[in-house]
From Swiss-Prot:
Principal cellular location given in the protein's record: cytoplasm
Protein name, as recorded: Dihydrodiol dehydrogenase 3
Family annotation (InterPro entries): AKR, AKR1C, Aldo/ket_reductase_CS, NADP_OxRdtase_dom, NADP_OxRdtase_dom_sf
Superkingdom, taxonomy of origin: Eukaryota
Residues reported in the UniProt entry to bind substrate: H117
Subcellular location: Cytoplasm
Organism listed in the record: Bos taurus
Matching CDD domains: AKR_AKR1C1-35
Amino acid sequence: MDPKGQRVKLNDGHFIPVLGFGTFAPREVPKSEALEVTKFAIEAGFRHIDSAHLYQNEEQVGQAIRSKIADGTVKREDIFYTSKLWSTSLRPELVRPALEKSLNNLQLDYVDLYIIHFPVALKPGETLFPTDENGKPIFDSVDLCRTWEALEKCKDAGLTKSIGVSNFNHKQLEKILNKPGLKYKPVCNQVECHPYFNQSKLLDFCKSHDIVLVAYGALGSQRLKEWVNPNLPFLLEDPVLSAIAKKHRQTPALVALRYQIQRGVVVLAKSYNKKRIKENIQVFDFELTPEDMKAIDGLNSNMRYNELLLGVGHPEYPFVEEY
């Protein structure tokens, strides 16, 4: 942690802000909103912005970042921007063109972090979710170690400062860590993580290898029908979280975010609501007690909101492992 406790050091020497702004929004949300809310998030104090080629909003998010640099709110080096390599570009020869496409959409010279979004390779092409005539995903077969080597080259070329992964299980991480001739370790593994699914085993594994765990879905997910089982309970209505929030005069969302930061997890707060964006930055204004942390640990039931079922049946589908 740096003095203000708001950034952690990655294993390659760069620093990542512990609180990030997630820019993903459902399809029906107009893309122009990504521009507005990202500008607002930067004004509110967010310095870590998380997006991806899959979100189809990098043009707007890049525009927001550039406008806040142009008006003097921030310098480029104040912003930590993450993009992600989508599953249709996991073949090694497609990695750099995919990153260059993101940079072109963003109109930025580099990203701070480039990560493999999901270890399941899909058929290359413009279609994000290629399917056959029966609506089944069309998989591709790619050695993730070769994909990783292509990411290492992107780092060497200065297109990204750091490289990492997302939605990997510990065996997939091990495969990269044990790869002969490994040049750079993944700096992070971005996974679903919240009090109902606290990823304690994966977190311990990552910490033991100096890999930062980044939490998405930290507030329990946006519950999009195509991704999330609608019968699952709402995290933010949990009585234990509510009681702890009341005690600290905070919201359950802030308690859920604070919980991650105190465990050494980098946490993404995803909201397109300006009041809540402003509220989420207040996560640094209070501290949970060891008793609070223990009570929240007790909520874990290994309940995954985002099963990413499109990858089921692929040999690299990550969620068949316990962690």
